Amino acid sequence: MAKAEYKSAIRSRRMIQHALVELLQEKELDKITVTDIVTRADINRGTFYAHYADISGVLDSIMENVCQTIREALEKQPLWAKAPDARIVLQHLQRMLESDPEFYRNAIRTNV
């Protein structure tokens, strides 16, 4: 049961993040409400607040996911390397972007 709940939480957070990125393509951040996000994500407000305190928390989560992907790519470099091999980092970033191109395309286009 706990594993299913964990998957459900991941799914809910992903839906919230995607909804926010989509909405940012339509209107300014300060015009987006939690109601807009939950309507777009097709979840209830309780689900939103179970995962995030506010909209800025969703933005922080999106950025943390991107930063974590970059950190993981850098950590794969040998400790003795003076500088990370840019090719490996770029390949990892490419895989990340290809995993969900629409999401990252919208996130990159967004001026937040």
Task: Indicate residue ranges for each PLM-predicted region.
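Short secondary-structure transition hinges
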Residues: E72, K76-Q77, P101-V112
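N-terminal intrinsically disordered/low-complexity leader segments
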Residues: M1-A9
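Residues that scaffold the ATP/ADP-binding catalytic core of kinase and kinase-like folds
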Residues: H51, V58-S61, N106-A107
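Residues in the helix-turn-helix
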Residues: M15, T47-Y49, F103
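Primarily secretory-pathway and cell-envelope proteins
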Residues: M1-A2, P78-E98, E102
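Alpha-helical structural segments
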Residues: R11-E22, E26, R40, G57-Q77, ...
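Helix-turn-helix
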Residues: L23-G57
